[in-house]
């Protein structure tokens, strides 16, 4: 089976970061970032990782019309078949049929995935658990996603979302608030999570940070943003 994955989704109206493409052919995997091919990080003139995808096809010796499943993140804008018909017939020539049959082909070959759920899937599939609970706190995730975090369970190869947070005051945005306060941009604050395991707890700083947040059964998570003169 051959699977091709793109981030971001073609024709998505929102700006994204770290464009990338992955191609899977049986047990072989090609995955790369567009910026490493073009040497331009987060290139604003590019709307999807075209060069990386073509490089993956070349490395695995396949043609676009051999792909069994195309995987895209769910776009913020409505899905317009005419746009995707252009994409699959002109840009990559993955579809060679009649325009009247395109919708059927599209429904069979294209899959849109939940951004936050993809993080939960990576953790669950990479573990040894046959069933587990998951909590994904990705803040905005894809910028068009209003959910701060999701909670659910994984069982029988199915992910079931039990709760979604759409408010502002939650632990994911608290993380963003703190990283913004020390100078990390919205696209880069995830790097602090990767570095956190190498740091040391500083009791004085921990005490000050705890003053900014309140957790209660009645109100959940609340945090004070005015401490650093940041209100949005």
Q: Predicted regions span which residues?
A:
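Short acidic/glycine-rich loops and adjacent helix/strand connectors
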Residues: 1-232
